[in-house]
Regions:
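Amphipathic helical "hinge" segments at domain boundaries
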Residues: 30, 45-108, 112-116, 193-197
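N-terminal helix-turn-helix DNA-binding module of bacterial transcription factors
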Residues: 1-57
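Periplasmic-binding protein-like
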Residues: 63, 106, 113-121, 173-179, ...
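An alpha-beta-alpha
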Residues: 162-201, 302-316, 321-329
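Short beta-strand segments enriched in small/hydrophobic residues
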Residues: 14-18, 54-69, 173-179, 330
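Hydrophobic alpha-helical segments within soluble ligand-binding/sensing domains
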Residues: 147-176, 186, 212-218, 236, ...
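Flexible loop/hinge segments that line or gate small-molecule binding clefts
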Residues: 119-161, 234, 260-272
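Flexible loop/turn connectors
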Residues: 218-332
């Protein structure tokens, strides 16, 4: 952050900022002084700060700058474990989906001379801030970002595996239960479509159901759906509860498969057939990749992260009701 940028943010001249930070502000309006000082502190400005801080000495600190604090704890655990294993400490920041807050955190990370950053940008516009890290020679690994060189969990692959499991149970009338404006849901749907295509099952927009749609359950019944792929475990629980309330049951009336994140790990009932999202493994992986960059052990990384995907149970799976053999016992 330069003195010119501070002046622009405060709406004053460069000389005014210079006078305030050098205690030569006797003739400056107190309100202006307070505003400038707040911006100086918020954006971690220090005179000649861009002349580094360019110490070549390593700090053995890694910054983690997340889009929001709703990130899974297991991903952070994975990052922390991999960092400690290699002798690094972590600086953790939450942008709160706010680009202004994000920039303040970026200037703080630069001031603290972090060796590298794991960065989840708030928006595509956030990429303009990349120059602050470039100027300080700070290595960056992006996650869930707006660049081709961004690390992602392969949710499309997971969507494919969930769908294939229903097909293995002979379900062909399928739907995908999603959340609107969710990157995870969009990728799960992509895998869902690919699996249908490769199994020569026609795709229809009617197969897309959104948990925010009050009519989604009626659509399941009216469309004769026998199997559901769910991108979020919370949505699966809502569906499960609604079915029981209306005297429909899983798996006898509907088979259900879902992704499951770590906040749901302790739920032992209902038994929904799920694949755990590998957040911890992902966190460890991106941290190791960043440390390799910091220590000049660069190679071509795999940006799409995949792990062995295993169902925790198959309790919410049965073949479609019309395929089940009914046994009749004749007495007498």
């Amino acid at each position: 952050m330069t003195i010119k940028e501070i002046a622009n943010l405060a709406g004053v001249s460069i000389s005014t900022v210079s006078k305030i930070i050098n205690n030569k502000d006797q003739n400056i309006n107190p309100e202006t002084r307070s505003r400038v000082l707040k911006i100086v502190k918020d954006y971690n400005y220090t005179p000649y700060g861009n002349v580094k801080n360019i110490s070549t000495a390593k700090s053995f600190q890694i910054g983690v700058l997340l889009r929001s604090g709703s990130q899974t704890n297991l991903m952070l655990s994975g990052i922390l474990h991999a960092a400690q294993e290699s002798g690094y400490s972590i600086l953790l920041y939450d942008s709160g989906n706010d680009m202004e807050m994000e920039l303040k955190h970026i200037t703080s990370l630069c001031k603290n001379n972090a060796d590298g950053i794991i960065w989840e940008p708030v928006s595509e516009q956030s990429m303009q801030y990349e120059r602050y890290f470039t100027e300080q020679n700070i290595s960056v690994c992006y996650i869930n970002g707006y660049t081709e060189c961004s690390f992602l969990i392969d949710f499309a692959r997971m969507g494919y595996i969930l769908t294939q499991k229903l097909l293995d149970y002979k379900h062909t009338r399928l739907a995908c239960l999603l959340k609107e404006k969710s990157q995870r849901s969009a990728l799960v749907l992509e895998g869902f479509k690919k699996c249908l295509y490769e199994n020569q099952i026609p795709y229809s927009e009617k197969m897309e159901l959104y948990i925010s749609d009050r009519e989604y359950f009626s659509k399941i019944i009216n469309y004769g759906i026998s199997g559901i792929v769910s991108s979020h475990f919370a949505s699966s629980l809502i569906l499960y509860e609604q079915m029981e309330r209306l005297h429909y049951y899983i798996p006898s009336d509907l088979s259900l498969v879902s992704l499951k994140d770590d906040v749901r790990e302790g739920i032992s009932f209902p038994h929904i057939s799920s694949v755990k999202i590998p957040y911890c493994e992902f966190g460890s992986y991106i941290c190791r990749e960043l440390i390799d960059k910091c220590e000049k052990r660069e190679h071509d990384p795999e940006y799409l992260f995949a792990a062995p995907y295993v169902f925790d149970n198959e309790d919410s799976l049965e073949p479609p009701s019309f395929m089940r053999v009914r046994k009749i016992v004749v007495v007498g």
